[in-house]
């Protein structure tokens, strides 16, 4: 089995109201060292062993482009790891 971790976040230059709100609250709480906050999504998926590693990467790329991220306003990256029975 493969486990995929997907990180989706607003593109640079795209307004991020959640990030701005979190940043302001952190400043109000006294965390003055925080220069900026971007709020995104984290998704995990489990893919079965019927796929090769190359197929898993290809399918993850397609899933990110078609559903998990909006490529107009969001960037994404993903990691895939092989999971053994002991790790499940």
PLM regions and their residue ranges:
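Long, contiguous binding/interaction regions
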Residues: 1-40, 48-50, 54-83, 87-88
């Amino acid at each position: 089995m493969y486990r995929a971790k997907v990180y989706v976040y607003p593109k640079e230059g795209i307004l991020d109201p959640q990030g701005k709100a979190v940043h302001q609250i952190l400043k109000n709480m006294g965390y003055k060292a925080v220069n900026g906050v971007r709020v995104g999504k984290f998704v995990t998926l489990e893919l079965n062993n019927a796929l090769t590693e190359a197929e898993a990467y290809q399918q993850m790329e397609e899933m990110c482009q078609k559903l998990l991220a909006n490529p107009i306003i969001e960037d994404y990256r993903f990691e895939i790891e092989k999971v053994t029975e002991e790790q499940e």
